[in-house]
Structures are given as structure tokens and as C-alpha cells.
Amino acid sequence: MTNNQQITYTNELQRKGIHITSMLIPIIYYFIDRPTALSILFPLTCITLIIDLFIHYNPAFRSFSHGMIGHLMRPHELNRTSLVLNGASWVMVAAVLTVFVFPKTIAIIAFSILILCDMFAALIGRKIGKTKFIDKSLEGSLTFLIVGIIVCYTWTQIFHLDFLFFIAVSTGTFFAAIAEAAAYRLKVDDNIVIPIVAGGISWLILYYFNGSY
């Protein structure tokens, strides 16, 4: 769950600059198989979760981490009264789930949508967003969809897949944009809901129409 209005735009830029490095996950996954990917992702995810545990239960470590990256953390991450996962932990959990659940092509696209669409939607939505759409801005959600279609087309070409595949993953992007806009009120972290919805809808369409993936 995120509310992008809770930190300054400059800090949002810095946060998303770090966030985009997660694109290394689908790029590297393109060149390796699922077991290898999971053997890398699972330990890294455990490390991020352990760091969150230290932040919550160890006051000295919490003070140190807040001093280093506190300006990039959202209020619900800083002012925690219960165990709260940071954005990095949610991204890593999402990566493991996406790679584990979905076929490789769909997983790569679903995770790319999470990283790129969420980033551009947040930045554009905060900069020019004026029209409310669920809990976000219409401008941000349209940016999410446009970037998503570009992502889907690019990966479809890389995978040498057909038009049905492109339509399926683009439809998944459409529903992911809606889910992202509603994630805050649904009390679901958008880092989880975006790839699960994008990948799930895409896979269902391809399964129903017996499409290639």
C-alpha cells in the first residue's frame, strides 16, 4: 500500500531511481531458467525480510537505517508500531511469487510492468495528475497503461510471440492499472497486486484461447 503524496517529489524521484534497478530481475531471468532464478531470488528476499525484522526489533539498527535512507521512506515505513515491510521487501516477495507462479514469458512481462509502469505512473501522476481515479489520478493510470503497452509490445517482439499474446498481456496491463489505483483502499501492497493481476489475467486469456506463451 502506498500513498505517493506522503514524500516530496524529489525524494520520490530518488526512490524510483532505486526502484528501477529491479529491472535487472526480469532481464537476468530472460537468460536463465526458473530454478536458477529462484535460487538467486529466494536468498535475496530472505535478506530483505531479515533487514526489516532488524529495523523493527533493534532500535540501534532502526536509527541507523532511518539516518541513511529515512528521507526515502514513506511515513507508514518510518512510523511503524507493528512489523511493516519496506518497499524493497515487497518487490522481492513479488519477484519470487511471480517467477514461481507464472510461465517465464508472462512472469518477465508482469514484473517489468510492476517496475516500469508503477514508476512512470507515480512520477507523472504526482506531477500533472488532477483528475481523481479511484485512489490515484487518471493521468497516472493512463501513463501506467501506455507504458505497459510499450513494455508488452517490446517483450512480445523479443520473445517472437504472436498478436494474441500481445493482446493478452496488454489486457493484463489494463486490469493491473485498475488494481494499482485501488490497492490502497483494498489494503493490498501494489508491489504484489500489480504483477499478480497482470500475470493472472494474461495467463487466463492465453489458456482460454490456447495461445502460445
Predicted regions mapped to residue ranges:
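Interhelical loop and helix-boundary elements at the membrane-water interface
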Residues: 1-40, 53-155, 163-213
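Short alpha-helical "patches" and their helix-cap loops
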Residues: 41-45
